[in-house]
A protein has these predicted regions:
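A residue-level signal for alpha-helical anchor/packing sites in multi-pass solute transporters
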Residues: 4, 13, 47-48, 81, ...
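Hydrophobic transmembrane alpha-helices
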Residues: 69, 95-106, 123-126
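Residue-level signature of catalytic and energy-coupling elements of molecular machines
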Residues: 21, 82, 106
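Alpha-helical transmembrane segments and their short interhelical loops
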Residues: 24-96, 146-169
Length: 180
């Protein structure tokens, strides 16, 4: 989403999107759902490779579909916000390097959070990537990080997705850094 917007801003073709006969809500939703589509395409291509390389089994298809959708939606909405705010690709790289990658690394991807000190466990439970990773882990292993973590993750990530959509919508509707 961010690359799409930056490319259009830099090339000057963002006006085609701004003055198209669709509402800001429709444009926001379309841009984010394009990211969701890319997320599902990556999953569809990756799963056969995973099956070939490792002995994996999907134990909860509903969780896999939900977490693929919600994770792609959140990252697409966040990407749209970054694409609206930033004016160059360096800004996207900075957000990726200083926010996305560190949050991913401290999300419990490579370890379970019960190995961490208590205060870091609490901090991990505020990290949306923790709930995304936990949801995917549950899809394949049906293991929860803590009792009710899947339910908490569904609620937390849904609220975050709605909030990010709203933020992207408001920035796009206002034309922040794209109507100048």
């Amino acid at each position: 989403s961010s690359s799409f917007l930056i490319i259009n801003k830099v090339s000057g073709t963002i006006v085609d999107l701004l003055y198209s006969p669709i509402s800001p809500g429709e444009a926001t939703t379309a841009i984010i759902l394009a990211a969701v589509t890319r997320g599902f395409l990556v999953a569809i291509v990756s799963l056969p490779i995973f099956y070939f390389l490792a002995d994996i089994e999907i134990r909860n298809y509903y969780a896999l579909i939900f977490y693929t959708f919600i994770s792609s939606f959140i990252l697409g909405a966040a990407g749209m916000i970054v694409g609206i705010i930033m004016s160059k690709f360096e800004g996207i790289a900075a957000v990726n390097g200083f926010l996305i990658v560190p949050l991913t690394m401290i999300s419990g991807t490579f370890y379970t959070i019960d190995k961490l000190p208590e205060f870091l466990q609490l901090a991990s439970k505020c990290n949306p990537f923790f709930f995304m990773i936990s949801g995917f882990r549950y899809s394949f292993l049906e293991i929860e990080e803590f009792d009710g973590s899947i339910f908490v993750g569904v609620i937390y990530l849904t609220i975050l997705a709605v909030g990010l959509w709203l933020g992207a919508y408001l920035l796009y509707k206002k034309g922040y850094k794209i109507k100048s």
